[in-house]
Structures are given as structure tokens and as C-alpha cells.
């Protein structure tokens, strides 16, 4: 089965949240690794916000604090980069449990930002019987 999730966010929305709440906002939403990867670039933070939303949609759940009590925590979905700089997803906690429940074998992620918008698309594949263990 194929699962998809997509999200788009105005970079200015994330910029305003950072200006208003500062490190409190950043630490609530993003992991230390995500923050380090963004080097303070609001566009990169916005793309990772969109990635978290896209993956949550792919999993069929919301983000806790956005999508209600049944959602996953922001830190349960981490949007990082592999050794070649390609976007990758690390799941933990409730997000990891939901992916296993769905039999997801892999998640692919694409991020972009331009003209004040950031977008992410996540695609996951599952099989009827798990072929291998996920890295998370």
C-alpha cells in the first residue's frame, strides 16, 4: 500500500512564531538535530514544520497541540538529512508505533521552499508482511 501526506506553510508564519516565542517555540517543535541542521534559517525550519505535518497526515493522525489529543508529539517526527544531504525521517514514540501498525517499510521525504512558502511531501510504502525492520 502507498500512503501520502503533503503540507504547505507560509514561511512568515514560522518567522512570526520564532520572533514572538523565540527558543521556547523552537525547542517545543524541533529537535536539537533539526535546529542545528537549519542553521537559523527560517525557511528551513518552515520546511521541517511542513515535513512533520506531512508525515502526520501520511500516518493518519494529527500533531498533538494541532490535531488533538489523538495525535503524535512534535518530537515524535524528526526531519533530518542523510549523509548525502537528502531529507529523511526518523520516527519515535506514537509516530513509530503507528508506522509499525500500518506495516510501513519506508518513508521518503521531499522538502522545498520558495516565494515565502515551504512545502513537504511524504510517501510511505507498506507490505502485507514486514520484509525488514525499520531503522527507527
UniProtKB/Swiss-Prot annotation:
Any one biological process term the GO annotation gives: fatty acid biosynthetic process
Known EC number: 2.7.8.7
Reactions performed catalytically: apo-[ACP] + CoA = holo-[ACP] + adenosine 3',5'-bisphosphate + H(+)
Principal location: cytoplasm
Subcellular compartments: Cytoplasm
Gene Ontology MF term list: holo-[acyl-carrier-protein] synthase activity; magnesium ion binding
Key words of the record: Cytoplasm, Fatty acid biosynthesis, Fatty acid metabolism, Lipid biosynthesis, Lipid metabolism, Magnesium, Metal-binding, Transferase
Magnesium among keywords: yes
Cofactor: Mg(2+)
Superkingdom classification of source: Bacteria
Pfam families: ACPS (PF01648)
Residue numbers binding Mg(2+): 7, 53
Spans through the membrane: none
Cellular component terms (Gene Ontology): cytoplasm
SUPFAM superfamilies according to UniProt: 4'-phosphopantetheinyl transferase
Entries under HAMAP family matching the protein: AcpS (MF_00101)
Summary of the function given for this chain in its UniProt record: Transfers the 4'-phosphopantetheine moiety from coenzyme A to a Ser of acyl-carrier-protein.
Family, as annotated: Belongs to the P-Pant transferase superfamily. AcpS family.
Protein name as catalogued: Holo-[acyl-carrier-protein] synthase
Provenance organism: Roseiflexus castenholzii (strain DSM 13941 / HLO8)
Gene name, Swiss-Prot/TrEMBL: acpS
